[in-house]
Amino acid sequence: MIEKISEIGVDKVTFIYTQHSERRKIKLDRLEKISIASMKQSNSLKKLKIEEIISLQSFLRNYNTNDEKYIAHMNEGNELLKKSFKKNESFTILIGPEGDFSSNEITDAHKKKFKSISLGKNTLKTETASIIACYSIIQLMS
């Protein structure tokens, strides 16, 4: 995922762990190397900033920006990203783990003004959902 989102021009990624996450550690140095190689390959002038992994609760507690905010999850009735999209200079999108966000995590995100969205009718792996969400936002911005 790091390689692909770096190629398409994402500025920053923060890994979060949730109730259903399988991993609570990442190899930051390995991800940095992948990002740099991808940046060089794609002739990008900006380096992807990769943040340390933190809990969703910590992320939401410390989150205070004017970004357009979305949380992608599997609940029926969520609008597609392209229907919910509002142009802004920066975006934050939360992508859940393979087991999705818990209902409490979704509620906590809503309290921080994250809007629930869908990335489509198919169930996607986290890596695929991340790439699709980032690419979709970049395309909707242009």
Q: Can you name each region flagged by the protein language model?
A:
Residues 73-87:
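Strongly charged, low-complexity linkers/loops
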Residues 65-71, 89-91:
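Short coil/turn segments at beta-strand junctions that form active-site/ligand-binding loops
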Residues 16, 72-73, 94-95:
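Short beta-strand segments
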Residues 50, 69-71, 114-118:
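Conserved beta-strand scaffold positions in the cores of enzyme catalytic domains, especially
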Residues 103-142:
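Structured adenosyl-cofactor binding patch, chiefly the S-adenosyl-L-methionine
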Residues 1-68:
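RNA substrate-binding interface of SAM-dependent RNA methyltransferases
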Residues 90-107:
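A C-terminal functional module that forms or caps the active site or interfaces directly
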Residues 76, 98-99, 121-124:
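Short, acidic/turn-prone active-site loops that include or flank metal/cofactor-
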